């Protein structure tokens, strides 16, 4: 199941964030990391240091100049956003996402996360099939 998923970080601002993402991915058996327009030079020592044992994910990460190229590697894009958006994209819950995974087994799925400070733009979201909202604390909604 893990090989079906790739993680797309759009305009990450900190090497530490990329490293923490790689480490979390490795904890759960994921290994496909795609990075769009990193705001820092990548790979860098901070990303590697924060990834601890996930150097393989950092070293194999693919870097893209734009979202369109990054998402072209997948046939389903699910964006994660803490904010509800007024755009023509279906917002889904975790339960909805589970149903999609069960009904469409042969998908190559990209999970897209936005920049740390601002989240995904509406333009970034336009490349998504769905927007997934994971329940979080009302006081701190950011997942990235």
Residue ranges and their predicted role:
Residues 1-144:
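Post-transcriptional modification and biogenesis factors for structured RNAs
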